[in-house]
Structure formats: C-alpha cells, structure tokens
A protein has these predicted regions:
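Compositionally biased intrinsically disordered regions enriched in Thr/Gly
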Residues: 2-9, 19-171, 175-266
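Hydrophobic core
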Residues: 14-18
Length: 266
C-alpha cells in the first residue's frame, strides 16, 4: 500500500467538490470550477432521492478507544459562508485521531476555497446536507480495529443558481499506520477497476439512476464496510447528485490491493 504524509496527503483521499472528482453538476448556473453533469438529465428545482440500494450505515459506535463526535463549524471566508458539522474523533491513538480530524477540516477548507470559482467573487453558502433517505449525512462512519473513516455531506448554494447541490467527501485512515488510504491504494490497476465498476454498479442500483455511462470518473468518494466498499456515484442533480452503492467484496476482491483487504476486515 502506498502511503502519503502530511496534510496534502489527506486531501488526496477526499472528493471535496464536484469538479475535483468528476461530480455531476449542472452546466449553466454553477461555479466555473464545477463540471457538467455526466448524464443528460435536465436538473430540477429539487433532487430526487429514491430509496438507496441498502440502508446507510449508522454513525460508528465508540470502539478501540475512539469516540465519534460531530462538531459545529460556522464562519465565513471571502464570499463563502458556512454553517456545518464536522465528523471528529476523540481519544484513541494521537497520530490517528489527529490525521483523521485534520483531514476532515482540510476537506471543508478546500470546499470553501474552491466553490467561489477562479474569480473568487461568487457568493456561496454551505450547510449540512443529506443524500437521504436513510439518512445519509455527515458522520464518523467506521471505527474498526485497523481503520477509521468519515463522510461529509454538505448542501451548497451559489448565488444565482437554480438550486443547491450536494457535495460528498470521505476520509479513510489506516489506524495501524496513521496514513490515509486512497482510491489509488485501493485499486492498483485503475483501468481494470473502472471497467469492473462500470459493469457491476448499475446492477446493484435498483433505483435505476446509475448507468454504465455514469461511471466514467475515478470514484474517490468511498467508505469501507464489513461487506464491501460503499461508493458514492455522481449523477445529475435531478437524480440526487450522488447514489450510494455498496459493492460486495466478492465482486471486486481480485482487484483490491491484497494488503488492503485485511485492513478493512472488521
């Protein structure tokens, strides 16, 4: 497994804004840094969130010396205001806790920095989001013997846009090494992983929102689960912005770095 040091490494594991990780967004009324939706669906005034493929995992229970927390964070930077919650850890191993907490704060900081666009003059507000139903919200999602992970779901609105949009970022830390685990660490063969996910994800989505042509970017928004890997697949705003789908281990195990699988064992 490749590891990366420092705050910049933590940022790599996150999909901070739509444009940074291929997130689907609408073409005409978004910030300049946000890409066009990968689907041809016309956005509506509110996203449709049909029943997920399976219930969203709950907030992790305290374990292995760590306690999950949600910390309120409110402020302003330039033209961006935010009033959100951050998943944080207390207790446990100092290096692991600090790497996780710093990574979460970096994700919010990057979102605040990038949403105003290149000119830095677009007014943006950021609040807590929910991919729902479930709910699927910001939380510490995993506290395991070898890994801790969290997700941030925020609803942001750029002044003049027709509707707000969801953003998703995830932070996954190897608690044996206090190093982030990235999409690159998960799948050494990027091309093979993309092709496999393109084949299996639509069949695991009973809502029909994910098609093969949706799966055309690195799915860097993901969380480990005991049964597999939960990916947050970007779709059009009208389809819900992101579709959470858990891919069972037996569908992707042969493509996952063999050193990673034991780390995710719960």
């Amino acid at each position: 497994m490749r590891v990366r040091g420092g705050t910049a490494a933590v940022a790599v594991v996150m999909c901070v804004i739509a444009g940074g990780c291929g997130r689907a967004a609408d073409q005409t009324e978004q910030t300049p840094g946000v890409s066009e939706s990968p689907s041809g669906t016309t956005p509506s005034s509110s996203a449709v969130n049909p029943a997920p493929t399976e219930p969203a995992p709950p907030t992790a229970s305290p374990a292995f010396g760590y306690t999950p927390e949600l910390t309120a964070e409110k402020g302003a930077q330039g033209t961006v205001t935010y009033d959100v919650h951050l998943p944080q850890l207390s207790g446990g191993v100092d290096a692991v806790r600090d790497r996780f907490n710093d990574g979460i704060r970096t994700a919010l900081g990057d979102l605040v920095e990038n949403l105003p666009g290149p000119s830095k003059d677009l007014t943006v507000s950021i609040d807590d989001g929910d991919l729902g139903p479930g709910p699927e919200t910001t939380r510490v999602a995993v506290i395991g013997p070898h890994v801790v992970a969290g997700i941030q779901v925020y609803l942001w609105y750029a002044g003049g846009a027709a509707h707000p949009n969801q953003s998703v970022s995830t932070t996954v830390i190897n608690s044996d090494t206090a190093q982030p685990i990235t999409y690159d660490d998960l799948f050494p063969n990027q091309y093979a992983a993309m092709e496999r996910l393109r084949q299996v994800l639509p069949g695991l989505d009973p809502t029909g929102r994910v098609r093969q042509d949706n799966v055309n970017v690195r799915l860097e928004q993901w969380l480990p689960t005991p049964t597999g890997v939960r990916f947050y697949v970007p779709v059009s705003h009208a389809a819900g912005d992101f579709v959470p789908i858990t891919v069972p281990w037996d569908r992707i195990r042969d493509l996952v770095d063999p050193k990673i699988v034991p780390v995710f064992s719960q």
